[in-house]
Amino acid sequence: MSENDANARFIRESIAEPSPIARARAHAIELGASPISAAVGAQIAVLAAATGARSIVEIGTGAGVSGLWLLRGAPQAVLTSIDNEPEHLAAARQAFSDARVPATKARFITGRAADVLPRMNEASYDIVLVDADPENVIDYVEHGLRLVRRGGMVLVPRILGGGRVADPVQRDEVTSAYRSLVQETQESSAVLATVSASGEGLLQLISVGES
């Protein structure tokens, strides 16, 4: 086992996922959803706590897994969850109920993110999590940066694409989009950007405005 593999295994096995999130994960997998890993979940919870987030948007519910992690870090926040799959939103509602999240802390919007995001108020949110339609990830991140206030954060899990992004031979549409997103955000004066290798990877962007 390589050092990287050993580190990844240690991180994966050291994270204790709360029971409500573990149940939501099991249900998500039954539905064919692809929830974020516990490693990424724990990381976004820490980021939500560190920012003191009060208003969060997630694009793609993961049947409730990502939302529960975000609210674990920022229980004071109101979460807006957007998904085109009614069944996934229903599962998220049930997961939030099981976790005793107050109904006032979450709102669920059924629809295509490409249709919903342009209607949302700019500079009104602390965090936007992008975890849907990877072929549209660049557009969604642009919307996310419009929606967050200065100092707000846009988070993109799965950014390493299962190792494909680091392999220059891989040139499929999704891998190329992830690779371009990482490169463009590193060069942008509008954001501070970093990539974490935890779980399936997490791109973290902080809006700082044009210099």
Model region roles, listed by residue range:
Residues 1-127, 134-155, 159-211:
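A short alpha-helical cap/connector motif
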